[in-house]
């Protein structure tokens, strides 16, 4: 058996990030050949990934990356098994590398990102393979649960990540004054994270869904013995409350509960003589 030096073990650890004992064993199994040892560890990572495939990856983080000009942004949820790993530099660094890769290549889905190749820091592996390698390195199953990409050539993209990186949001505004709209977009991203809207405005709520809700509210009111002449008023009131909960522009603004988000948008239009609308938003909460 070839003599394995401490320097070789250290070099392999620096390249792969795997523990010293595993690096030593890999070199021993590979007769001291560094490239074969790297391949050995990658295969071991893939085997461990297969072994842990049935494990549940419920911890992790929500990671976001924006372009410098705020014309593009990506948000993703990367899962692992324990909070200990989720808070570690290796995991958070890997999540950051994935967001950068997704943004640079305009990857719009997990499948598109998994097919891309990472840089030298991750052995130029495809993300799909790198996930298995990271499983071997961290000893936990990793899962790229979801991803969204916003491109705003005629607007601005902003984000908000709650401390702890378990909740994040991405917002796209369509506006002819993108430089002035940065703060507004940031505020709306915070609104989305805090208030969890489902749609941007009333028109986005399907009419058939509203009719179903209306009938449910009607039957509830009748079941409670409400007089027929008051039922429609009760139903309308409950629908308004529903809109205020799920429609972004109908929600009370988190920075001033006396006004709605729609008022904030109107104020921006008047102040800057500008057009602005919420083009899209995404809210990710870990484990949802």
Curated annotation (Swiss-Prot):
The keyword Transferase does not apply. Gene3D superfamilies: 1.10.286.20, DNA helicase RuvA subunit, C-terminal domain, Elongation factor Ts, dimerisation domain. It comes from the Bacteria. CDD domains: UBA_EF-Ts. GO terms for molecular function: translation elongation factor activity. Residues 82-85 are annotated as: Involved in Mg(2+) ion dislocation from EF-Tu. Disulfide bonds: none annotated. One of its GO terms (cellular component) is cytoplasm. PROSITE patterns: EF_TS_1, EF_TS_2. It holds the Pfam family EF_TS. InterPro entries: EF-Ts_dimer_sf, Transl_elong_EFTs/EF1B, Transl_elong_EFTs/EF1B_dimer, Transl_elong_Ts_CS, UBA-like_sf. NCBIfam families: tsf. Belongs to the EF-Ts family. Associates with the EF-Tu.GDP complex and induces the exchange of GDP to GTP. It remains bound to the aminoacyl-tRNA.EF-Tu.GTP complex up to the GTP hydrolysis stage on the ribosome. This is Elongation factor Ts. The gene is tsf.
